[in-house]
Amino acid sequence: GGGAEKSWKPFKEELFSHMSGRVLFLALGTGLDIPTFPKNKEITAIDISPKMLEVAQSRINAYSGSIKAEVMDVHELTYEDNSFDQVFTSCTFCSVPNPLNGLRSLRRVLKPDGQLFMFEHTGSRYYPFKIMMDLMTQITRKMGPDMNRNTVKHVKDAGFEISEINHLFLDVVKTIKATNPA
């Protein structure tokens, strides 16, 4: 991965170190996060793009555990209700067209008391950054990511109980830990 990926690596490693049980990893992409996964886990990973998963295949093959990669849209998960113990996301919800529905979909497949772990960049309340993020969002929204989403609000509105929020870069980049209430 590039420079930005490297600087977030320790934070991702810490977040992903909590992986246990049946794990769903959302938006695997080209697999840049795989080297930060703990060893010997069984992970189901999805991405909307078959091409991305093709590129990820060498990283999937190199992983010490097992990664079952599937082409799937978070809005249309084909898994049974209560299928997973944990769900992990990494810079995903800036690109999900309907984040609230996506999070509700994740909650459906998460067992009661299951955990959601997120590494996300979100909108800022700090004035200079808020202005910059608003401007960047005007530009990037046309191309894809909306970096200015209120992800914390979406997580709550989807019915999750947030247990922890860690601000890694002001209030723009953060980790969120939440539970699917029983």
Explain the meaning of each model-derived region.
Residues 1-4, 117-175:
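C-terminal alpha-helical "lid/dimerization" subdomain adjacent to the S-adenosyl-L-methionine
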Residues 2-22, 32, 36:
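Conserved alpha-helix/loop element of class I SAM-dependent methyltransferases that forms part
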Residues 22-76:
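Class I SAM-dependent methyltransferase SAM/SAH-binding core
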Residues 42, 113-115:
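Short glycine-centered segments of the SAM/dcSAM-binding site in methyltransferase folds
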Residues 75-87:
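A short acidic, Gly/Pro-enriched loop at the edge of an enzyme's catalytic core
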Residues 86-98:
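A short SAM/SAH-binding and catalytic strip from SAM-dependent methyltransferases
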Residues 100-112:
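A short glycine-rich, Lys/Arg-flanked "PGG" loop and its adjoining helix->strand segment in the class I
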Residues 175-182:
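C-terminal lobe and adjacent flexible extensions of AdoMet/dcAdoMet transferase-like proteins
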